[in-house]
Regions:
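Extended, low-hydrophobicity, polar/charged segments
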Residues: 1-177
């Protein structure tokens, strides 16, 4: 097992932050649960909207539905504001995908795709490169709080810096009420 694979999820996030030129000590491991946006907002005493919700989707490739062909699956990370809901129809339209080609990942698939468990999926430090879409509603806040690899670890970051370190694509993805 490589040194990278042996690192804990939080250590991987700290290493990824350092690789981006950020202080790994930004990561706060808290006694409180931060696995939901509401819990994270309470734990860091921040507005709900400043919490980054991480949603992992699976995009199915062109072989989907062809008898005998393996289903190609590519993970897609979608980051939205804690006080918003991702609009799957809008997401599909932005990606030019049919309903059959995009679905939310199950917890085991999230772990397999990113190396992190649901409730702790960060914007960086994944096993492999994951395409990342970041909703623009997060830009309302000077500082946003992202998961740091476990259900009780988070880190603060400016929205623009989040887009940069995640190699993310800023896009409008939330439901309009």
């Amino acid at each position: 097992m490589s040194h990278e694979l042996a690192a804990t999820p939080v250590e991987r996030v700290k290493r990824a932050l350092a690789d981006c030129g950020l202080d790994p000590n930004l990561v706060r491991e808290l006694p409180a649960d931060t696995s939901t946006a509401e819990a994270a907002a309470r734990a860091v005493d921040a507005p709900l909207g400043s919490i980054v919700k991480s949603l992992v989707f699976l995009v199915y490739g062109a072989t989907e539905g062809i008898p005998g062909a393996p289903a190609e699956r590519t993970p897609l990370l979608v980051l939205v504001s804690g006080d918003q809901r991702a609009d799957v129809h809008r997401l599909r339209a932005a990606l030019g995908l049919s309903k059959k080609r995009l679905r939310i990942a199950q917890p085991a698939e999230v772990l397999d795709s990113t190396g992190f468990e649901v409730g702790g999926v960060p914007p960086i430090g994944h096993w492999a490169t994951v395409r990342t879409l970041i909703d623009r509603t997060l830009s309302r806040f000077d500082v946003v709080w992202a998961a740091a690899g476990s259900p009780n670890a988070v880190f603060p970051i400016a929205y623009s810096r989040l887009v940069t370190i995640a190699n993310g694509e800023a896009i409008d993805l939330v439901e309009e009420f």
